[in-house]
Amino acid sequence: MLIQKRISFGYKRNVLNEITVYKEQAEVVKFIFELYAFEQSLSEISKALEMYNTPSPSNKAVWGRQAINNVLSNEKYIGSDDYPQIINSELWNAVQERKCNNNYSKKYISAK
C-alpha cells in the first residue's frame, strides 16, 4: 500500500495508519455539499463558513472559492477502497450536475 503524505480534508490516519473519518471536518464537508446542492454560491458558502469560524484545509480563517471547489470536486468523499464515505452518492451526483450546468452556462454566456 502506497502511503500518501497528505490526505483529504475530512479524513485522518489512525494508529494503524489507516484513513478514517475526521468527524469535525467531515461535518464541514457535508455542510459545503448541502449548501451547494441547495443553490448556494461558492461566495455564500465561504461567508457561511466564516460566520461559523470554520478553519479551511490550510487553517486559514477564510475559505477561498478554490478550496470550496476542491472539496466539491473530491471523489474520495463518496468512498473508495482507502477512503470511507462521507457524502452519499445522491448528494454527490446533485452537486456534480449543478457544477456541470454552471460550467455550461458560463461557457455559453461568455461565448455570446
Which residues make up each language-model segment?
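Conserved catalytic breakage-reunion loop centered on the nucleophilic residue
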Residues: M1-K112
